[in-house]
Amino acid sequence: MYEYLDRRYALALYKIAEEKGKVEEYLEELKDVTDIINNDTQFLEFIEHPEISTAEKKKTFINVFKGKISEDILSFLLILIDKGRINQLYSKLKEMGKIYLENHNTVIATVKTVIPLEDDERETLTEKLRRKFNKEVLIKEELDPEIIGGVYVEVNNMVIDGTVKSKLSEMKKIMLKGEQR
């Protein structure tokens, strides 16, 4: 529901970062701030507490982050506090990361296997995906013993399922269909 807003905030910050040639730096700073917030339960409770005023939250953010992050990122955080959206900072970071990848003609492929891919398998898969999507491909590997064997690939919500588990499931459906006749 809020993806549109997340994207608007992220795009606004991305444009500022791009103008200043600091996209990677700003992404890293946002990631660091997000990690600090998510890993400190007291800080997270503080920013989510409804009885703590916006002014107090902004003052705290200025005290904690001023001089440690860029003024643009600090201003961005203060705007999110004003708008009551600071607790969705991770969503903004994720959207900004997507915008960065789009602008660099790159996609992320989530690849699930039972055992880690060998270097040559990873290179072959990357090259095939690069040709299929006509984009640079970053492989994000995940181990998943439930797929039994084979490979499961997801790119931009498109799935390529070459797993043993899916083949067994297909065979089961065919066999059950045959019994019903």
From Swiss-Prot:
Keyword Coiled coil tagged: no
Chief location of this protein within or outside the cell: membrane
Signal peptide: none
Localization per Swiss-Prot or TrEMBL: Cell membrane
Keyword Magnesium carried by entry: no
Membrane association type: Peripheral membrane protein
Pfam families, alphabetized: OSCP
Classification via SUPFAM superfamilies: N-terminal domain of the delta subunit of the F1F0-ATP synthase
InterPro entries tied to this protein: ATP_synth_OSCP/delta_N_sf, ATPase_OSCP/d_CS, ATPase_OSCP/dsu
GO molecular function: proton-transporting ATP synthase activity, rotational mechanism
Its job: F(1)F(0) ATP synthase produces ATP from ADP in the presence of a proton or sodium gradient. F-type ATPases consist of two structural domains, F(1) containing the extramembraneous catalytic core and F(0) containing the membrane proton channel, linked together by a central stalk and a peripheral stalk. During catalysis, ATP synthesis in the catalytic domain of F(1) is coupled via a rotary mechanism of the central stalk subunits to proton translocation. This protein is part of the stalk that links CF(0) to CF(1). It either transmits conformational changes from CF(0) to CF(1) or is implicated in proton conduction.
HAMAP family given in the database record: ATP_synth_delta_bact
Protein name: ATP synthase subunit delta
Organism of provenance: Clostridium kluyveri (strain ATCC 8527 / DSM 555 / NBRC 12016 / NCIMB 10680 / K1)
